[in-house]
């Protein structure tokens, strides 16, 4: 006999992660009074299969790596408050322990874009004839 398998996609852990992301975003915006996390945006949440842990990835609007590390520390210290607030809205027996991670993807992307722009500018300086002929390969 073959087992019935659920289709790949939006399973229970995905639904719980989505709910945690929405609720944490609301909590950070309206419940947290610390200015170091006011500009935090929850980018992604992944939940372990047994729902015991939630990895929470966040960014800070217009802030650097140092501010991100500080915000990560603040959120880690506030994880008990955040977890108990989450427990009221989640329909699970237990509420996952929250682990916060500062997501440096936007800063890295901006840096890479800047490097590409600089390389293009240097290339144009070294080979200006390509710009005139429209042959930019």
Curated annotation (Swiss-Prot):
Biased composition (Basic and acidic residues): 117-127
Keywords: Cytoplasm, Ribosome biogenesis
Primary site of residence: cytoplasm
GO molecular function: ribosomal small subunit binding
Role summary: One of several proteins that assist in the late maturation steps of the functional core of the 30S ribosomal subunit. Associates with free 30S ribosomal subunits (but not with 30S subunits that are part of 70S ribosomes or polysomes). Required for efficient processing of 16S rRNA. May interact with the 5'-terminal helix region of 16S rRNA.
Family: Belongs to the RbfA family.
Subunit organization: Monomer. Binds 30S ribosomal subunits, but not 50S ribosomal subunits or 70S ribosomes.
Protein name: Ribosome-binding factor A
Species of the source: Alcanivorax borkumensis (strain ATCC 700651 / DSM 11573 / NCIMB 13689 / SK2)
């Amino acid at each position: 006999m073959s087992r019935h398998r659920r289709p790949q996609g939006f399973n229970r852990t995905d639904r719980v992660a989505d709910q945690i992301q929405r609720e944490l975003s609301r909590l950070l915006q309206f419940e947290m009074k610390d200015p170091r996390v006011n500009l935090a945006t929850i980018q992604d949440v992944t939940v372990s299969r047994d729902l015991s842990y939630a990895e929470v990835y966040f960014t800070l609007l217009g802030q650097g790596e140092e501010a991100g590390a500080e915000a990560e520390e603040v959120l880690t210290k506030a994880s008990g408050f955040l977890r108990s607030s989450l427990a009221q809205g989640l329909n699970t027996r237990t509420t996952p322990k929250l682990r916060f991670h500062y997501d440096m993807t936007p800063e890295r992307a901006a840096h890479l874009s800047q490097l590409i722009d600089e390389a293009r500018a240097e290339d144009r300086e070294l080979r200006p004839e390509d710009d005139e002929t429209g042959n930019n390969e």
